[in-house]
Amino acid sequence: MRFMVIVKASPESEKEGAVHDPQLLLEMGKYNEELIKAGVVLAMDGLHPSSKGVRVKFSGGSHTVVDGPFTEAKELIAGFWIWKVRNIDEAIEWVKRCPVDGDSEVEIRQIFEMEDFAPVLTEEQIQHKVAKRAELPNQTANK
């Protein structure tokens, strides 16, 4: 099973030019090495503050671009991992080991696999999507 592990932003992570704690960065590096060694990580990255981002809102066939920053830090994302683990319990156990600084929140969400769409897609459609996904860089077919 694949999961997206979402590190929620904080007021500190949303500050422009925020200086990260060197000790926390060292601990996070070691944690990431453990995840990689265990074969859990498929992708991972941290994100710049929302002040460097935009939102594109769609309504009635048109779109509007809204520049950051965005005010509700608790609704923003500071970083993420994509993990492949046996189940959500394994993901939870890994998250519990995550080094954090102060108050933090991490959300775990299961990623759809092709077989999840079996009730609405034909086998041919699923195979086509699996083949297209395999063409993406750093991707494996998920069927």
Functional labels for PLM-detected ranges:
Residues 1-143:
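Conserved, structured core segments of small domains
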